[in-house]
Amino acid sequence: MNTEKLKDIKARIKDFKSYKTSNSKIQQKINPFSIALDLVSGTMVGLLIGILTDKFFNSKPLFLIIFTIIGMIAGFNIIRRK
């Protein structure tokens, strides 16, 4: 009786491992829409922060340029981590 339980447990573990590897392959595929969304959203957040900071300090578009570049870098970093 114990050997039957042991075989059952081993079969369940084997099924779980095969299920886990099949799901990881699905998650490795990167959706192009997700890439575009990450890049555009990072840039837009940088633009928004830059515009608001320029209005707050009443300055030329210095902060707009700085935060736009930072937003683009953040978008590329998010894509790279995926």
From Swiss-Prot:
Bilayer topology annotation: Multi-pass membrane protein
Top-level division of the source organism's lineage: Bacteria
Signal sequence interval, chain numbering: none
Transmembrane segments: 32-52, 59-79
Gene Ontology CC annotation, any one: plasma membrane
Keywords, ordered alphabetically: Cell membrane, Membrane, Transmembrane, Transmembrane helix
Alphabetized InterPro entries for the sequence: ATPase_put (IPR032820)
Intrachain disulfide bonds: none
Entry's localization field: Cell membrane
Protein name in UniProt: Uncharacterized protein RP024
